[in-house]
From Swiss-Prot:
Required for activity, annotated site positions: S371
Protein name stated in the entry: ATP synthase subunit alpha
Gene symbol of the encoding locus: atpA
Record has Lipid metabolism as a keyword: no
Classification lineage: Bacteria, Pseudomonadati, Pseudomonadota, Alphaproteobacteria, Rhodobacterales
Naturally occurring in which organism (per UniProt): Paracoccus denitrificans (strain Pd 1222)
A GO cellular component annotation in the UniProt record: plasma membrane
Subunit structure: F-type ATPases have 2 components, CF(1) - the catalytic core - and CF(0) - the membrane proton channel. CF(1) has five subunits: alpha(3), beta(3), gamma(1), delta(1), epsilon(1). CF(0) has three main subunits: a(1), b(2) and c(9-12). The alpha and beta chains form an alternating ring which encloses part of the gamma chain. CF(1) is attached to CF(0) by a central stalk formed by the gamma and epsilon chains, while a peripheral stalk is formed by the delta and b chains.
């Protein structure tokens, strides 16, 4: 049998042409050392900072340190399953998380994997976790209210959509309670687009908390129906530090989906102190030089680049917004520590909670003197602005006078009146947990307090009086509340007469 040269050359040419098409090109490296959630890897020369890499067994990691001879990788999982000499593969992708309305009602981890046992997410898109914040031109100043349902906050420290308002205080002062009540309060407004109210989608990020605490919170949200418009991102105390560091960024990417598509979202970081601690742990293990309180030099940038992503966009960019309520835990009321001062300077105001007030029974324990909202007054409703003005001033004068009144008993009538009014207003600002009020209810209650309707009521009965008033309004004056909710206007003229009539009507039944 003769060998045909042409046939052989055709086969060879074909094989050369198709050579290597099926071969998978993957850049791999080798683990040099591993421990404490950090792996040192040799051989990943072209890897990007922030890129995902894959270890054997499907464990993922993220590249943080790029050095001359190796790269430092933080591991999103158990480092006990990784050993020296293991192969590490590049994925070519920066850390991404799922985003979209499919995440509402779900509990996910820092990488967006569902942990609530309700099946896969089927999210409509994926977004990079750590992206640049919007520039100056796409933004608009904050002008729409974001109601928390808490009298002391909505009247004196108002928050607007697109604002960053810090909640700061010691442990066990009710920081999470304020955030949770804000989520629950949105049930009064969500789904009412016909009345000109945009739905506020909520994202709650639990960083370094106990699993039992997160489970209780999710249970409360489900019981009240608030889970329908809420996503919970959990990186609990037992999760590795890289997960606690990443969770706020991942959750913000999920919130940006709403912001960039012309919708409104609220994100609660609970809390950023623990994220800073997780980042400090990672940085020290990666041998980055420590700075003040052993935090790395870029810990300010850690929080500033996160919180700058919360913004109100202008009409040309869809008019969406992302509002942030970061929480910071202080030690013994020290707000001059490193992380608290950093976050205070980044945010647009703070709600300051005090242990002393909490134990006096003033809950929410808001110190109205130290709390401030730098942009919120522009976002207050007209009705609230017209009645809430005198409250902060009267309470400030009351606190000042109360300090003097301890020394002398012979007070003139004007001072005595101020003290009596202040004591009743302080009592009026108290509010039980899980019972947020609508804007209209708060306006009427505060109007009653500032116009002297409470002056004849004993201080101990103020809470009872207010509870009765709310019941009366909901049962007898529901149309007034509805009208105030739909048509926001200054409390004057007809509206003021209607409120006075309602209060006079209640006064007769209370007597």
């Amino acid at each position: 049998m003769g060998i045909q040269a042409a046939e052989i050359s055709a086969i060879l040419k074909d094989q050369i042409k198709n050579f290597g098409q099926d071969a998978e090109v993957a850049e791999v490296g080798q683990v040099l050392s591993v421990g404490d959630g950090i792996a040192r890897v040799y051989g990943l020369d072209k890897v990007q900072a922030g890129e995902m890499v894959e270890f054997p067994g499907g464990i993922r990691g993220m590249v943080l340190n790029l050095e001359t001879d190796n790269v430092g990788v933080v591991i999103f999982g158990d480092d006990r399953d990784i050993k020296e000499g293991d192969t590490v593969k590049r994925t070519g992708a920066i850390v991404e998380v799922p985003a979209g309305k499919e995440l509402l009602g779900r509990v996910v981890d820092a990488l967006g994997n569902p942990i609530d046992g309700k099946g896969p997410l089927n999210a409509s898109e994926r977004r990079i976790a750590d992206v640049k914040a919007p520039g100056i031109m796409p933004r608009k100043s904050v002008h729409e209210p974001m109601a928390t349902g808490l009298k002391s906050v909505d009247a004196m420290i108002p928050v607007g959509r697109g604002q960053r308002e810090l909640i700061i205080g010691d442990r066990q002062t009710g920081k999470t309670a304020i955030a949770l009540d804000t989520i629950l309060n949105q049930a009064n407004y969500n789904g009412r687009e016909a009345d000109g109210m945009k739905t506020l989608h909520c994202i709650y990020v639990a960083v370094g908390q106990k699993r039992s605490t997160v489970a209780q919170l999710v249970k409360k949200l489900e019981e009240t129906g608030a889970m329908a418009y809420t996503t919970v991102v959990a990186a609990t105390a037992s999760d590795p530090a890289p997960m606690q560091y990443l969770a706020p960024y991942s959750a913000t990417a999920m919130g940006e989906y709403f912001r960039d598509n012309g919708m409104d979202a609220l994100i609660i970081y609970d809390d950023l102190s623990k994220q800073a601690v997780a980042y400090r742990q990672m940085s020290l293990l990666l041998r980055r030089p420590p700075g003040r309180e052993a935090y790395p030099g870029d810990v300010f940038y850690l929080h500033s680049r996160l919180l700058e992503r919360s913004a109100k966009l202008n009409e040309a960019n869809g008019a969406g917004s992302l509002t942030a309520l970061p929480i910071i835990e202080t030690q013994a009321g020290d707000v001059s520590a490193y992380i608290p001062t950093n976050v205070i300077s980044i945010t647009d105001g703070q709600i300051f909670l005090e242990t002393e007030l909490f134990f006096q029974g003033i809950r929410p324990a808001v110190n109205t003197g130290l709390s401030v909202s730098r942009v919120g007054s522009a976002a207050q409703t007209k009705a609230m602005k017209s009645v809430a003005g005198p409250v902060k001033l009267e309470l400030a004068q009351y606190r000042e006078m109360a300090a003097f009144a301890q020394f002398g008993s012979d007070l003139d009538a004007a001072t005595q009146k101020l003290l009596n009014r202040g004591a009743r207003l302080t009592e009026l600002m108290k509010q039980p947990q899980y019972s947020p009020l609508t804007n209209a209810e708060i306006v009427i209650v505060i109007y009653a307090g500032t116009k002297g309707y409470l002056d004849g009521i004993p201080v101990r009965d103020v809470t009872k009086w207010e509870h009765g008033l709310l019941q009366y309004l909901r049962n007898q004056k529901a149309d007034l509340l509805e009208d105030m909710t739909k048509n926001d206007r200054k409390v004057a003229g007809e509206l003021e007469d209607a409120i006075k009539a309602a209060l006079d009507g209640y006064a007769k039944t209370y007597a």
